Amino acid sequence: FSKQDKQHLQQRSLELMNALQLDAKLLERPSSQLSVGQQQRVAIVRALVNQPELLIVDEPTSALDSDARDSFVDLLLGQVQAAKVTLIFVSHDRSLAQHFSRQLDIQSFVVAGEKHAV
């Protein structure tokens, strides 16, 4: 990275951390010293900092309690919408469906050539 690119990425990281309610001082701490919720939000910062067109998250709320889970999803969706990123959110937690305008239940799908549901 050039110095300018590095500065831009650092600035973008700080903006995302602020938007996701993370203190910039967390950058100085090892991830093992962060709460699970903080680790999840830092992972989202890392995923969004390069402004991807597509973000795929697999069970990002599995280790969070219901309050932290809903807060995390709201923060994630806010950032995804602001960045105009397509999000594929994978979860076994059906209660999260309320947060999304479209859901796909793969349990009800049949694989071509198969006679039984997957």
Sequence positions of predicted segments:
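Conserved ABC ATPase "signature" region
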Residues: 8-25
